[in-house]
C-alpha cells in the first residue's frame, strides 16, 4: 500500500487502565512493528491524541511543548509518536476529542456521551465542569488526512495539533451548547464526584 493510517487502538482512559498490557501491545508495540517494516516509498500518518499534554494551567499548549501524559492511554500513544518521529519520516496529528456521526457510535467520547445522555435520560450529572477540552468534527479530521497525503513530502517528519481553536471549552460550556439544540433537559452540577480523567488544557 502507498499510505498507512494506523487507526486500530485501545482508546480512552477507562479502557486502557482496565488492561494496561493489552493497551501497550496494541497502541505502542504494533506501531513499532509497522514502522520497522515500512518500505522507503510508503507514507505513514499517525493519529495521536492531545491527551499527551496532560493537565496544564499555564496557557495554551503548542506542538513545541513537552508531552506529559497522565494516563496510560496517553503514555502508549506518545511512545508510539516518538518512535514514528525518530525511526521514520511520518506525519503525526495530535487529535482533539473527535465527535460526529458513525455507524458504530462511540459514546465514551465526551461530546457524544453528553448528547446521548441528554437525548435518552433528559438529564446529566456533571462534575469538575470547569475542566477545558478541545474538540474537532470527524469530517475535519478526514480533510486533514487527505491534505497531508497530497502534501506529504512538504510536511513529513512533523507533528501537528488538530483541533478547533474556538472549541477550547469547559465541560459546562459543552453541555450548554448541546442543550441549545435539545429541549427539556436538565443538568445537575455535582462537587461530590471527581473525574478520574484529569486532562485540562487549551490547545
Predicted segments, located by residue:
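NAD(P)H-binding glycine-rich loop region in Rossmannoid oxidoreductase-like domains
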Residues: 1-25
